[in-house]
Swiss-Prot record:
Entry protein name: 4-diphosphocytidyl-2-C-methyl-D-erythritol kinase
Residues the record lists as binding ATP: P99, M100, G101, G102, G103, L104, G105, G106, G107, S108, S109
Keyword Nucleotide-binding applies: yes
EC class name: transferase
GO biological processes: isopentenyl diphosphate biosynthetic process, methylerythritol 4-phosphate pathway; terpenoid biosynthetic process
Function: Catalyzes the phosphorylation of the position 2 hydroxy group of 4-diphosphocytidyl-2C-methyl-D-erythritol.
Membrane-traversing stretches: none
Pfam families linked: GHMP_kinases_C, GHMP_kinases_N
Record lineage: Bacteria, Pseudomonadati, Pseudomonadota, Gammaproteobacteria, Enterobacterales
Domain of life: Bacteria
Keywords: ATP-binding, Isoprene biosynthesis, Kinase, Nucleotide-binding, Transferase
Amino acid sequence: MRTQWPSPAKLNLFLYITGQRADGYHTLQTLFQFLDYGDTISIELRDDGDIRLLTPVEGVEHEDNLIVRAARLLMKTAADSGRLSTGSGANISIDKRLPMGGGLGGGSSNAATVLVALNHLWQCGLSMDELAEMGLTLGADVPVFVRGHAAFAEGVGEILTPVDPPEKWYLVAHPGVSIPTPVIFKDPELPRNTPKRSIETLLKCEFSNDCEVIARKRFREVDAVLSWLLEYAPSRLTGTGACVFAEFDTESEARQVLEQAPEWLNGFVAKGVNLSPLHRAML
């Protein structure tokens, strides 16, 4: 039997770079919220112990894909602790709607959905804490998708505190370029010393993203989309880009602006949600 699992997008409602560690990783403070929009992952169990991704991503080797890596990591971890039946495997396919290099967390969300779904389907019985710890080895954003609640993140993104920001409507736009994260983080002009503040203080301040100035400087497409959106509503970069978003109080307001968008702007309207669609589907 084939089962389907949501793999939602996320937005960074704000993102501040507070420092850089000796190992090169940047410390940050950011606010994650999910969208009721994303990819869909389909899973069909196998009994021969094999993991097969039926919808390969162009330019990504099978074993390098985060979906396959997540499945194999769970398989090994559960098997090593005697919590996996012999022969457990899976055919996995994905209906991909989220762009790569968009700052919407697509790959991390895919990995988290696979961890949560296969833990359930294989009846491994691993806790969310265990799954989140495994997820962190796959990517800094994976744990928030595993835990499934909007969160304030610190450290390199792994220290999570659940929060409940307002669930607004967003017009999310893709400028048509992909921005590799290192391009932003290696830029010498990236702000790296934004003062650390408490969650309470940050939630009262106007939200912004320290990466935005670099993305706008290096990618004229990002600058053009943001300039257009800012004529209608508060708008920011999410993550390190390339996607940007404008926030609205109602769905109709967001859709009215999208209808006016120039032909070169690709976008969609989605609601911000504090409980991940993946976890909502499991209730």
